[in-house]
Each structure stands twice: as structure tokens, then as C-alpha cells.
């Protein structure tokens, strides 16, 4: 594994490396994007904020920067990311490259906020890419799984530093369906978690607030990220272990965790402190993005499959909204989306669950999250993305020898 400390060093490493060349980040992708028997690159020595342009509302960061490490320096500069997911351990290059997202009907993925990037090609050339320079590469490269080249710097749109107030509560699932449009439109961020064998959901909203920011709670490690302590995660993992050993208790455990509403209540924090949540229970995950208008029908059908087949497990289904974008391989290309995520505890076989629900996602025209488990390959994926052929043409032009394709990506990209 090679670990460059500068863009020049990165370019030399890529130019001279034995293929396939892949970049490893924080290991938060479930798909084998980084596996290689060639050259593995780490950008851990290429981290930090390069600069903040307050007038243009943008910040440039080094590609190896972890999302959690950007929060405080950006905040100190008076800005924050416009949106994040509930995990902030990822490297920004990997999060952008796979279309990682949070929730919010007026907010896109992290990729949609990319205003420019610097890309090291297979030949070791460094390209500056933006709407005004190498525009085609910028258009296609914002979500590109590292198959066009290696990011060295990324420029993101940012907002003036802001506070968010979080509210969590339990509501009947039937009420959630009736009020879904209203809840989506009334809040900057809305999502819910549904334990499919329960009749209630755990809803969550985040809205901009001027309330005083309370001191973070929990251990010192959690304080810097504004997270709650992880006692509830330990209880939840115990429940997962019980369900693995005694599958018949899955339903009662799901109803217990729903009605216990772990994490219920309200709190206010700076945005970078409140977006992330403690995630200490390991799992495997599948996520698809379906048209937003079909989201409620799709998740209900997913839950019905789980109930009908009595598939054991304790993890909830997660439901979020993401705004459409124009990125060629984005799951949100040209359509507002609802993302639906199913999880299985790492101690259990995930295949029975994922094999059962994936056809439901296909029925609704779902596009898979690039970093999460799915079974689609190039022939099927090409039917989901109108710009597929144009992207593949761009990829072959930039990397004619397929230097950035490992075995998995050859199947996904079509060789």
C-alpha cells in the first residue's frame, strides 16, 4: 500500500503503479470497491482544509480528509457543510465518489455540492475540473467510484455556520403514511426508522434554530462529535444477539425498541455535531433510491415481504429523502428520491433478507447505493442510468487500459 503526502507524489505513484489501482478510505463501503491484487493507495496523509472562500460559499479540502475532521476547522472559518449523513467517519473522496447523502427534500448528496475537483489520471496527469474547465469530466466525475482517476482536492459548496434542533418521536405507521408529504415539506430534514414487525415508526427531524447550544454529552471521544453516549447501542446489540440465537423473538424485540424510542427527545447542536450518530453495532446494508412519489408504497411492500417470510432480525428500515441532481451515475439523477435502507446484524446471514427485498426495489425502478450491497451488474445498471454510455465513453478515454478497474468493477462497469 502506498501513502502519498502530496499531489505530485500521488501522480507519480499512480503513473508507475501496477494495476489495478484502487484507493482505500475509511472502509465504510460494503461493496468491494477497494479490493485489488495490484496497488492500493491511501490518502490518509492528504487531509485538511486547503482554503475557504466566504464570498463564494465554498471550501476546498484534501481528498483524504475524514468528514468528521472537517467539521471544526470549517466551523472555525464560519461555515459548515450543507448536509451530511448520520455517519461521518468516511473520507470525503469516498463519500463523494459513491454519492453518499443525508436526508432533506431540498438537499442533494455530497456529490451534488462538488463545485470543482482535481483529478489524477491513469497516466499521472493532474486535471482541474469544474463547470468551466474539463467540464465533461466534472459532470460525470462527481459520482464515479474512482474509475476515472484519483481525487486529490475537492471544492464543496458550504453554508454559513448554523445550528440544528433535532426531534425524535414515535408515531403510528398509519399516521406516518398520511402525513408523509406534510412532514417532508415542513422540515429541513425528515427521516424515519421502521422496525417492520412493529406498527409504529421512529420519526426524526432537524431544523435550523437560534437556540443556545448545550454542552455535548457522553464520553470525551463523543463530545467532539456532539453524539450521545452509546449505552443504547450496547442494549441494541444485545437485542441483535438474542434475535440471532432465538429468531422467534425478533418481533417482540422490534416492538420493544420502537416503543422504547431510544434516542427520543430533543437537542440542539452546531450542524457538524448533530448530523452524526453513534453507530457501534456492526451490520450489512442494502440501500436503493426510488422515485420519491413511490417511496411509501415501496417501503410498505418491503416490510410486508419481511413480515410474510418471517425474516429474523432487529434492525429497522431507514427512509430518507434526497433532492434530484444532474450527475451521470448518481442514484438521484434527474429525479427526487426516497432512499430505503435495510440492514442485517453482522452476526446473521444477510442474504435471506436482501434476496427477498431486492426485487421489490427493482419493481419501483430503484437505483442501488454504490457503496452498499446489491446484485446488479453492468447490463442491468445501464438500463437505470440514461447517461451510462456517455460515462463509459469518458471512462475509456481517460483510462483506456482500465487501470482503475478491479474484478468487481469490471463486472459493474462492463469491462
Question: Could you tell me what each predicted segment is?
Answer:
Residues 1-3, 56-57, 161-165, 341:
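Short, basic, glycine/proline-bearing loop/turn elements
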Residues 31-50, 102-124, 150-157:
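Structural signature of FAD isoalloxazine-binding scaffolds in flavoprotein oxidoreductases
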Residues 115-308, 313:
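C-terminal substrate-binding/cap subdomain adjacent to the FAD-binding core in PCMH-type
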Residues 1-89, 96-104, 192:
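Glycine-rich N-terminal segment of FAD-binding domains in flavoprotein oxidoreductases
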Residues 75, 125-127, 331-332, 351, ...:
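Non-transmembrane, aqueous-exposed alpha-helical and coiled segments at domain scale
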Residues 261-384:
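Substrate-recognition/cap regions that form aromatic- and gly/pro-loop-enriched pockets
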Residues 364-415:
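Activity-critical C-terminal alpha-helical subdomain
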Amino acid at each position: 500500500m502506498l501513502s502519498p503526502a502530496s499531489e505530485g507524489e500521488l501522480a507519480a505513484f499512480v503513473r508507475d503503479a501496477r494495476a489495478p489501482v484502487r484507493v482505500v478510505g475509511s472502509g465504510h463501503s460494503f461493496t468491494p470497491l477497494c479490493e485489488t491484487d495490484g496497488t492500493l493507495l491511501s490518502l490518509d496523509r492528504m487531509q485538511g482544509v486547503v482554503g475557504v472562500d466566504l464570498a463564494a460559499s465554498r471550501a476546498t479540502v484534501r481528498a483524504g480528509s475524514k468528514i468528521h475532521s472537517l467539521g471544526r476547522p470549517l466551523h472555525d472559518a464560519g461555515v459548515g457543510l450543507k448536509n451530511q449523513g448520520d455517519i461521518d467517519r468516511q473520507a470525503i473522496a469516498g463519500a463523494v465518489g459513491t454519492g453518499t447523502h443525508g436526508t432533506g427534500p431540498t438537499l442533494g448528496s455530497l456529490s451534488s455540492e462538488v463545485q470543482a475537483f482535481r483529478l489524477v489520471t491513469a497516466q499521472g496527469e493532474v486535471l482541474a475540473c469544474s463547470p468551466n474547465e474539463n467540464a465533461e469530466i466534472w459532470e460525470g466525475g462527481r459520482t464515479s467510484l474512482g474509475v476515472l482517476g484519483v481525487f486529490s482536492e475537492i471544492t464543496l459548496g458550504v453554508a454559513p455556520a448554523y445550528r440544528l434542533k433535532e426531534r425524535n418521536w414515535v408515531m403510528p405507521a398509519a399516521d406516518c403514511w398520511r402525513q408523509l408529504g406534510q412532514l417532508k415539506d415542513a422540515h429541513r430534514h425528515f427521516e424515519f426508522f421502521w422496525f417492520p414487525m412493529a406498527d409504529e415508526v421512529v420519526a426524526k427531524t432537524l431544523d435550523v434554530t437560534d437556540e443556545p447550544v448545550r454542552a455535548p454529552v457522553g464520553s470525551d471521544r463523543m463530545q467532539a462529535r456532539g453524539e450521545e453516549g452509546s449505552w443504547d447501542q450496547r442494549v441494541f446489540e444485545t437485542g441483535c444477539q438474542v434475535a440471532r440465537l432465538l429468531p422467534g423473538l425478533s418481533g417482540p424485540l422490534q416492538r420493544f425498541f420502537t416503543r422504547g424510542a431510544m434516542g427520543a427527545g430533543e437537542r440542539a447542536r452546531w450542524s457538524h455535531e448533530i448530523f452524526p450518530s453513534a453507530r457501534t453495532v456492526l451490520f450489512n446494508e442494502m440501500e436503493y433510491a426510488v422515485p420519491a412519489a413511490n417511496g411509501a408504497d415501496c417501503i410498505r411492500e418491503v416490510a410486508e415481504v419481511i413480515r410474510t417470510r418471517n425474516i429474523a432480525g432487529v434492525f429497522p428500515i431507514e427512509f430518507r429523502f434526497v433532492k434530484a441532481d444532474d450527475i451521470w451515475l448518481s442514484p438521484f439523477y434527474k429525479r427526487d428520491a426516497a432512499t430505503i435502507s435495510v440492514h442485517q446484524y453482522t452476526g446473521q446471514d444477510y442474504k435471506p433478507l436482501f434476496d427477498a427485498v431486492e426485487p421489490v426495489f427493482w419493481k419501483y425502478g430503484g437505483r442501488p447505493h454504490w457503496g452498499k450491497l446489491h446484485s446488479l451488474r453492468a447490463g442491468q445498471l445501464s438500463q437505470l442510468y440514461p447517461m451510462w454510455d456517455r460515462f463509459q465513453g469518458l471512462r475509456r478515454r481517460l483510462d483506456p487500459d482500465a487501470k482503475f478497474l478491479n474484478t468487481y468493477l469490471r463486472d459493474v462497469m462492463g469491462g
